Regions:
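Bacterial N-terminal signal peptides
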Residues: 18-27
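Non-heme di-metal
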Residues: 33-220
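Bacterial N-terminal signal peptides that target proteins for export
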Residues: 3-19
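C-terminal motif of bacterial Sec signal peptides marking the signal peptidase cleavage site
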Residues: 29-31
Length: 220
C-alpha cells in the first residue's frame, strides 16, 4: 500500500506542474498588459492643469474682445474695433493651440466657465484690456513657464513662451491706442495662424515668436 501511494503522488505531480505553468503564464501576460496600459496613462501634472487654465483664459479673452469690438463700433471707433478683431483672433488661436496640445496627450480639454465682463465705453475697454494682458504677460505665463521647466514639459514650455511674446505685443498695441485716446489710424493687422502673434507691417519675413512665414499671416 505504501508503494502504491508513492506512485499516485508521482503520477499527479506532472499535472500540478502543468497547472502551475498555465497560472504563471496567465499572470505574466496580465502583468505585461497592465504595464503597457500604465505606460499609456498620462500622469496628472501641474502643467497639464495649467494648460486647462490657460485654455479657459484664452477663450474668455477671445469672447471679451468680441464684446469690446461691438462696443467700439457703437462708439463709432472703427479703428479700435479693427484692433479688437485682430486681438480676438489672436486669443482664439492661443486657445486652439492649448486644445491641440492637450489632445496630443490624450486629454480632453475641460469646458471653460465664462468669466463675467463689464463692458464700459470704448476708451474704458482699452484700459481694461491692457490690464488683462499685463496680468497674463507679466504674471500668469511666467508662472506657467517656470512650472513647465521644473516638470520638464518642453512642448508646453515652448507654447507658453510663444504666447507670452504674443501677449506682450497685444500690450504694445493697446498702449499705443490708449496714448492716442483711441484715435488710432486705420491699420492692416496681420495675425500669425500658427501662434497668434499680431503684426502691423509686412516688412519682415517671419513671425517674431514662432518663425512662421509672414506671407501666410491672416489679414484682419
Amino acid at each position: 500500500m505504501r508503494h502504491k501511494k508513492i506512485i499516485l503522488v508521482v503520477k499527479s505531480h506532472p499535472l500540478s506542474i502543468a497547472l502551475i505553468s498555465i497560472f504563471l503564464t496567465i499572470a505574466f501576460f496580465t502583468g505585461c498588459q497592465k504595464t503597457s496600459e500604465e505606460k499609456k496613462t498620462i500622469q496628472p501634472t501641474v502643467t497639464i492643469e495649467n494648460l486647462h487654465t490657460a485654455y479657459a483664459k484664452e477663450m474668455n479673452r477671445h469672447k471679451m474682445y468680441e464684446s469690446f469690438t461691438a462696443r467700439a463700433l457703437k462708439d463709432k471707433m472703427k479703428n479700435v474695433a479693427q484692433l479688437y478683431r485682430a486681438l480676438a483672433r489672436s486669443e482664439e488661436i492661443h486657445a486652439l493651440n492649448h486644445i491641440k496640445l492637450l489632445k496630443s496627450l490624450n486629454i480632453e480639454p475641460r469646458q471653460p466657465q465664462d468669466e463675467p465682463v463689464t463692458v464700459g465705453t470704448a476708451l474704458q475697454t482699452l484700459k481694461m484690456a491692457l490690464s488683462m494682458e499685463e496680468i497674463e504677460c507679466g504674471s500668469m505665463y511666467p508662472s506657467l513657464i517656470r512650472t513647465a521647466e521644473l516638470e520638464k514639459q518642453p512642448e508646453a514650455l515652448k507654447q507658453f513662451q510663444i504666447i507670452q511674446d504674443a501677449d506682450s505685443k497685444h500690450g504694445e498695441l493697446l498702449r499705443y491706442a490708449i496714448d492716442r485716446g483711441g484715435d488710432i489710424p486705420q491699420l492692416k493687422y496681420l495675425v500669425c495662424p500658427g501662434c497668434g502673434y499680431v503684426l502691423t507691417t509686412e516688412q519682415t519675413d517671419e513671425c517674431p515668436a514662432c518663425k512662421g512665414k509672414v506671407a501666410n499671416f491672416e489679414k484682419i
